[in-house]
Amino acid sequence: TIPRGQWKFSADRGSVEMAAGFEPHRIYEVVYTAQDPVLVGLGPAAVRDFHSYLKHGDTPVAPVRRAYAFGTSQSGRFLRTFLYYGFNQDEAGRQVFDGVIAHVAGGGRGSFNHRFAQPSRDAHPYMNSFYPTDIFPFTDVEQTDPETGLTDGILKRAAETRTAPKIFYTNSSYEYWGRSASLIHTSVDGRSDAPIPENTRIYMFAGSQHGPASFPPSRSIGQQRSNPNDFRWAMRALLAAMDRWVREGAAPPASIHPRVSADTLVAPEAVQFPKIPGVAFSTRIHKAYRADYGPQWKSGIVTSEPPKIGKAFPMRVSQVDPDGNEVAGRHAAAWDGTD
């Protein structure tokens, strides 16, 4: 912590100055007392009410019988937040969305419903680590964190009101390394697979990145060229599968993802990545930490800033074969849309 007397806000209050200068390659974070927060939290209510109106209201504009929600990355985390707070029940107690597809959201939710929330913030290995995005609970089913004693689940409220939709969680390989995806289907201690509700499916696209690159792949900031492995064909098949599931009750393909019980979901240091010329394999991974934002956090008010940080949750990733390819998950070249 840098003493307050060694730095100051600039005249326009838009930047920070320090007489001694800033060290290169370090990330500085300013903690200060703010005022006059903008109104946040209306988004989930607006999404709920608009789709409830289309589905249940007396409207000749666009009457619908079934409503599906799809979100990618940040909007996927929005949908997990939407479900967690019970917004899939409208004010009349009716179900809003029949089906939800949260894509490449990993284990996160988001800053969409608390004072001074910044929706665009999401935790990464090198920045924004302690913003309230990757926080307990992670699984749809209720679990108890032995470290804090908290018991909760993403679908706790929806299960109580019988308004839980049918759900697909789809993730790329990256989300297991950079977005804590393993937490959505493991026990809190990471030693076993967590139960998955009948209304939920989890799919992992092996050997893929957060969003497929164009082909031929180009160089970016990474060690290797961007990954063009395209999972959008499978996403189209899953959309059709979701529609059949809701309309006809036809069960979609079973969940497919790395599992602790199959030794395909392991700690990063246990990955048996082969030695490949020109490839440097790193076991550095984004971690989700137990964070205490203060006694009013349940009401959406942060009173402990920075938060009090506890132990990290155990992160797990997919094991690889002798060629370095992930052994679990959906392999695009081998999947024809059936299970």
How should these model regions be labeled?
Residues 1-339:
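C-terminal His-loop and adjacent cap/lid subdomain of alpha/beta-hydrolase
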